Amino acid sequence: MAKCQICGKGPASGKNVSHSNRRTNRWFRPNLQKVRVLREDGTVKRMWVCTDCLSAGKIKRYVSKSVEA
């Protein structure tokens, strides 16, 4: 779950900086979503994808056909 399986974006390290300018280490984690992706061969696979790739339309999301009662 640590990386986007489309673009490879992963956690980046940085610093928290307080008002008194003290610095502590922290992680900037990507916003990953577990989505069902429709692949080119017609199969469906669950993948961890960052929201940047989702909003850019880099993947085609699979939507199951719901049965109406």
Swiss-Prot record:
Keywords, ordered alphabetically = Ribonucleoprotein, Ribosomal protein
One biological process term from GO is: translation
Sorted alphabetically, the Gene Ontology cellular component annotations on this record are: ribonucleoprotein complex; ribosome
Instruction: Recall the GO molecular function terms of this protein's record.
Output: structural constituent of ribosome
Query: Keyword 4Fe-4S on this protein?
Result: no
Q: Mind telling me which Gene3D superfamilies this protein's record contains?
A: Ribosomal protein L28/L24
Q: What is the top-level taxon of the source organism?
A: Bacteria
Q: Where is this region: Disordered?
A: 1-21
User: Known Pfam families for this protein?
Assistant: Ribosomal_L28 (PF00830)
Tell me its family: Belongs to the bacterial ribosomal protein bL28 family.
- Which named protein is this? Large ribosomal subunit protein bL28
- Which organism is the protein's source? Thermosipho africanus (strain TCF52B)
